[in-house]
């Protein structure tokens, strides 16, 4: 089995607008998505090498130093599949995709030569 890094993305601007939504409406929508996400995870639990976690604020390190940055990554996971296509197909219909302009990226993980 091959390993794949999965990143769940949503534009920062979309999330900022979502936070302005009526609190009762937002709570109901978030509870619905949590329930759908939990069901999806239970249905696909066999593909996860690491269910991952949410990610926070971003720092960028360059030759010039360290600075704050923003990106659209909300969460990450590690999954196992026979092929890249099979890994990607596993995420079709994922509840995360209900977020406007969201996406899920799946990248094959390769061992670094000579590294443990």
Residue map of PLM features:
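Conserved, structured core segments of small domains
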Residues: 1-116
């Amino acid at each position: 089995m091959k390993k794949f890094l999965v990143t769940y993305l949503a534009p920062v601007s979309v999330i900022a607008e979502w936070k302005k939504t009526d609190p009762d409406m937002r709570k109901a929508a978030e509870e619905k998505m949590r329930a759908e996400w939990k069901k999806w995870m239970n249905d696909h639990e066999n593909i996860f090498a690491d269910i991952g976690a949410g990610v926070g604020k971003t720092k960028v390190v360059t030759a010039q130093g360290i600075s704050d940055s923003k990106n659209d990554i909300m969460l990450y996971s590690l999954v196992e599949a026979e092929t890249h296509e099979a890994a990607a197909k596993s995420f079709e219909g994922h509840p995360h995709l209900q977020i406007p302009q969201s996406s899920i990226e799946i990248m094959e993980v390769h061992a670094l030569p000579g590294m443990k």
